[in-house]
Amino acid sequence: MAKSDVKGVNLGMGTGRRKSSVARVYIREGKGDIKINHKNFDVYMQLEKLKTIALSPLALTHTLGKYDIYINVYGGGISGQAGAIRHGIARALFDLDEEYKMVLKSNEFLTRDSRKVERKKFGKKKARKSFQFSKR
């Protein structure tokens, strides 16, 4: 459930994960400021594709510009971090207002993407790629 912060404003919290990245997201009503690790959103996320991935829960629920979002993200690369931010924003929106649940769940934003890099096996070049086979 949403908690209220010092000023009495509703505060939604969510933790998102993707690959090896973890994002802690805090949402409250405001002007639409988005900060990632104390940096502006446009400075931290420079690729347009990753921006749309990270903000897709807000676009889906038509809440872009209604909330101030503070994100602390660590681990992994920029693609995994964008996915973790998307997951965290979706969970925080659900925590703030439960009427978003059906919209977010139907688009699978509340589900954690469990795909990770497969480990390399011994006797092989990569996880699945084998060395060249010679009959003779």
UniProtKB/Swiss-Prot annotation:
GO terms for cellular component: cytosolic small ribosomal subunit. It comes from the Bacteria. Coiled coil: none annotated. Keywords: Ribonucleoprotein, Ribosomal protein. InterPro entries: Ribosomal_Su5_D2-typ_SF (IPR020568), Ribosomal_uS9 (IPR000754), Ribosomal_uS9_bac/plastid (IPR023035), Ribosomal_uS9_CS (IPR020574), Ribsml_uS5_D2-typ_fold_subgr (IPR014721). GO terms for molecular function: RNA binding; structural constituent of ribosome. Pfam families: Ribosomal_S9 (PF00380). Belongs to the universal ribosomal protein uS9 family. This is Small ribosomal subunit protein uS9.
